[in-house]
Amino acid sequence: GLWQKIKSAAGDLASGIVEAIKS
């Protein structure tokens, strides 16, 4: 549902931030 899409998008954003910090 919509909530799952929101959680997925938030997870992708968080992963991107983590990768940016690590690199």
Curated annotation (Swiss-Prot):
Domain of life: Eukaryota
Leader peptide range in chain numbering: none
BP terms from Gene Ontology: defense response to bacterium
Subcellular location as annotated: Secreted
Keywords of the record: Amphibian defense peptide, Antibiotic, Antimicrobial, Secreted
Assigned GO CC terms: extracellular region
Tissues where the protein occurs: Expressed by the skin parotoid and/or rostral glands.
Role summary: Antibacterial peptide, that adopts an alpha helical conformation which can disrupt bacterial membranes. Each caerin displays a different antimicrobial specificity.
Family of this protein: Belongs to the frog skin active peptide (FSAP) family. Caerin subfamily.
The protein, known as: Caerin-4.2
Native source organism of the sequence: Ranoidea caerulea (Green tree frog)
